[in-house]
Amino acid sequence: MKNKVRVPFSPDHPLCAPKLFTISAPAGAGKTTLVRMLAREFPDSFQKTLSLTTRAPRPEEIPGVDYQFVSQEEFQRRLDNEDFLEWVALFGEYYGTSRLGIDEIWKSGRHAVAVIDVEGALVLQSKIPTVAIFISAPSQEELERRLKQRGSEQDTQRQERLQHSLIEQAAADKFEYVIINDDLEKSYEVLKSIFIAEEHRNVL
């Protein structure tokens, strides 16, 4: 068993304040898996925001845990009510981050972690302070292999995602941290170290 050295997060301490972490990556780079690992180790320190989307759940996804899956009509209703801090249309589907969801996580004394696309992360950066993390596959070839292995897209959809990944990769320099996910365990250790360091950064 590994020894863990970590100073407990104390949200009531005057130097501590809950933060918003954004984690973005091309489809297939491994962001969802890494965030699940983080959630298992630090359940009391942070909570993943529940993004809304109009797309269908993938086989491994759990409604109400990975996303809140809604109809086009429900998404439009939320949009009309200005419920979203950011929203995007991607591959014919809609994705949005609820401002109320982030506020509720902060009120609980935990950090909020938004697993969102690059465009959404950049919008959030322009509105509120964030800790922006970009996760990349080691190569386009590896990204394509992972998408094929995932098997949740048709060939046309997969090619669209691969083309879009080039645009996302070009925006990596707009993020504070970049993790090349060529080894899941090592990448998780890097992500964890970022989380712990930022958790105790003096923001005053």
Swiss-Prot record:
What is the top-level taxon of the source organism? Bacteria
Reaction equations catalysed: GMP + ATP = GDP + ADP
Q: What Gene Ontology molecular function terms does this protein carry?
A: ATP binding; guanylate kinase activity
Enzyme class, UniProt record, top EC level: transferase
Instruction: Please verify whether the record's keywords include Kinase.
Output: yes
| Primary localization | cytoplasm
Binding of ATP occurs at: A25, P26, A27, G28, A29, G30, K31, T32
Ranges for domain Guanylate kinase-like come to 18-196
What GO CC terms are in its UniProt record? cytosol
Name the Enzyme Commission number(s) assigned to this protein.
2.7.4.8
Q: Which Gene3D superfamilies does this entry report, sorted A to Z?
A: P-loop containing nucleotide triphosphate hydrolases
One protein family per Pfam: Guanylate_kin
Function, as annotated, reads: Essential for recycling GMP and indirectly, cGMP.
Question: Which HAMAP family does this UniProt record tie to the protein?
Answer: Guanylate_kinase (MF_00328)
For this entry, the protein name equals Guanylate kinase
